[in-house]
Amino acid sequence: MTEPSYLTATRASYDTVAVDYAERYGNALASMPLTRAMLAAFAELVQAAGDGPAADIGCGPGHVAAHLNALGVPVFGVDLSPKMVEVAQQRYPGLRFHEGSMTALDLKDGELGGIVAWYSTHHIPTEQLPVVFAEFHRTLAPGGHLLLGTHVGDERLHLQRAYGHPVSYESCLLPPDRITELLAEAGLIVSARLLEEPGEGRKRPHVCLLARKPEPS
């Protein structure tokens, strides 16, 4: 099967910027107390459920996975970009990272106790998000949790330069209510939302959504 062009373009772009991206964002959590609070809540929920490891889907240079690991969560990372996987593995040799696409995860049904998708789903065209959210639902155990962070907007951007390099990828921005609807349609129910308004270092609002795959009644 031919790979969709947006995946090919996104992979190539992040292979190009991987090292510079890691230098810019690799320690970003140190100055993001609200994000750390949401990650801590997610970690507590995943540990309490005890339904399996967490996966950082679209893990980039691995800093979010490493933070969760430090909180006691067994976690591994998946990224579309082999160069990002290489950078993450070099930065955190004690963790496991591998290549993969969130559109077709090489994971068993119900294998995960938690999923983090941190600023990765916005690279998926809106019409393909149901496929991704269905994969999240499939791979989560009943009662498992999803933490999704992303930019807020209502537009589709095409980026041609990022992190000092030429790139070619899209960023598909949605309002939080629309993301919540799409998650619900996939069977993932949002229980908490953190919205950060534009401010220092942020040109756009950011949202963090905590969702859960319900257990059978």
Protein language model regions, located:
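Short alpha-helix
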Residues: 171-186
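Conserved beta-strand signature within the Rossmann-like core of class I S-adenosyl-L-methionine
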Residues: 144-150
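A short glycine-rich, Lys/Arg-flanked "PGG" loop and its adjoining helix->strand segment in the class I
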Residues: 130-142
